[in-house]
Amino acid sequence: MRVIKLGNIDINIIRKKGFEEGSIEERIEEYCRTTASQHTDGLLERYTQLDESRNGNYINSDLMKMVYPFYAESFENRTKYNLSITNSAAVLTNEAFRRAIQRPDVQRCVFIVGPYGAGKSYFSQSLFEREEHGMLANSIVYEGSITPPAF
């Protein structure tokens, strides 16, 4: 599956979290915002290449964070920079969904929502593992939280 290329997202829709000016968290956040707004197509293409994205048919903001190599490279970085990357990943995730529903082969979207730690990701991935039944043919799966967003 190829990403529909529509150009870059507007950096102004990626909210800043208000980190202390000059802090590493603020610098990482700005890097993520800038990269998302200048390389949207490339980041979304990278997302489709992640095995867990199921060729971009599974859309999830936590997984979207993995398109940033510095974040994906270690558990320590994922813990340390999670808040700095959250809003950029959320906007990229929304853009991935927006583009996915424009694909002519997508006929439905399965939404999986629940609170943090409820097992949404496990359930979502198990749907794909049982795909021999054809249950997800021509579908995308969008997983999200029903708790207040981080931004």
What residues fall within each predicted segment?
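Glycine-rich phosphate-binding loop of ATP-dependent small-molecule kinases
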Residues: 1-151
